[in-house]
Design a protein with these regions (language model features):
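Acidic/histidine-rich, surface-exposed loop or edge segments in extracytoplasmic proteins
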Residues: 1-16, 45-54
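Weak global preference for isoleucine
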Residues: 2-5, 25, 29-32, 42, ...
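Mid-length scaffold segments of soluble, non-membrane domains
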Residues: 20, 24-85
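Proteins with a high burden of low-complexity, intrinsically disordered sequence enriched in S/T/G/P/A and R
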Residues: 1, 60, 97-99
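Detector for Asparagine
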Residues: 67, 133-136, 152, 158
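Mixed-charge, polar/low-complexity N-terminal
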Residues: 11, 16-18, 95, 105
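Low-complexity, Gly/Ser/Thr/Pro-rich intrinsically disordered linker/tail segments
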Residues: 142-158
Length: 158
C-alpha cells in the first residue's frame, strides 16, 4: 500500500517544491482515508453533523486530527516527506465567545493535524474533518486556518 501512496504522491506533484509536496500530502491523506474507511466501515460525512452523534462511522475533529497525524507519521517514516516534518496537532476556538453569543458550535474549539516546512518553519494545518472521508483535506498556513468561525473554514487542497 505504501508504494501505491508514494506513486500517487509522485503523480500529482507538478514540481519538486514545498507547495507541491503539500498538494501531494493532501492527495495521499485522501487516498489513505479511502483505504482505511473501506476496511473499518468509516463513512464519515463532511464536518460537524450532530445527527451523527453515536454513529460509529462518523468522526469528530479530534478523531480526524489524530488519524491524519498518524497517516502523516507513516508518510514521514517511509521517507515520503522531503520538505516537511509532522508537528503536534493543534486547536483553535473561543469558548467564551461561544458562551456569550449563545452559539457553542460556531466557535467551538476545532482540532487539526499539523506539518511544518523544514526550511521556513512555517506550520500548516492539514484539516480532513471539513470534508467527507476520502476527499482532499485543506492544507493551509495555521495563521489562516479557522480564524473566524466554523462557517469560514478553508477550501480543500487540489
Amino acid at each position: 500500500d505504501i508504494q501505491d501512496i508514494a506513486a500517487e504522491m509522485r503523480k500529482v506533484k507538478k514540481g519538486d517544491t514545498p507547495f507541491q509536496e503539500r498538494r501531494a500530502i493532501a492527495y495521499a491523506i485522501a487516498m489513505i482515508e479511502k483505504k482505511v474507511g473501506a476496511k473499518l466501515g468509516i463513512k464519515d460525512r463532511a464536518g460537524m453533523e450532530f445527527g451523527g452523534t453515536g454513529d460509529p462511522t462518523q468522526q469528530d475533529c479530534v478523531d480526524e486530527a489524530t488519524n491524519t497525524t498518524s497517516y502523516l507519521l507513516i508518510l514521514q517514516s517511509h521517507g515520503l516527506l522531503k520538505y516537511h516534518t509532522v508537528g503536534i496537532p493543534m486547536t483553535k476556538g473561543d469558548l467564551l465567545k461561544a458562551t456569550l453569543q449563545g452559539d457553542p458550535v460556531k466557535y467551538w474549539p476545532h482540532w487539526t493535524a499539523v506539518i511544518q516546512e523544514t526550511k521556513t518553519g512555517q506550520r500548516f494545518a492539514v484539516d480532513s474533518w471539513i470534508y467527507a472521508n476520502g476527499e482532499n483535506p485543506a492544507v493551509v498556513e495555521v495563521e489562516k486556518w479557522y480564524i473566524k468561525d466554523i462557517d469560514n473554514l478553508p477550501k480543500a487542497t487540489n
